[in-house]
Amino acid sequence: MSAPVPGWRQPIAELRYLAATVGHVHGPTHPDMATLAEVVATLADSHGDDHAAHVALARRMRELTDGFNPWSGACGSVHRLYQSLAPIADVLSPALPEHS
């Protein structure tokens, strides 16, 4: 009997192409987008239950996207990618509450 597949696996696999496209189009002016595409691909390709690695990748996505806040003038694809990645990152590594 195999273990159940985590709910984030299918969405991250589906976002792989969008992340690669955003990285290709925006990478020259926003280098973090090329890195983000690599992080998404790594997470999509990950196997097993390496929770520590998944947490690290989720945190890296959050860092690269400035907390999933698109830059001023970002295209719709960037907005869609960020909006889709944020809940995955929250499942893998819940954001720490901000201090007042």
Mark where each language-model region is.
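Solvent-exposed, well-ordered amphipathic alpha-helical segments
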Residues: P4-I12, S46-H51, S72
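Short amphipathic alpha-helical patches
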Residues: T35-D49, L85-I88
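Amphipathic alpha-helical binding modules
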Residues: E63-S100
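Alpha-helical protein-protein interaction elements
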Residues: L18, V22, R60-E63, A74
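Short, charged, amphipathic alpha-helical segments
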Residues: M33-E38, V55-R59, C75-Q83
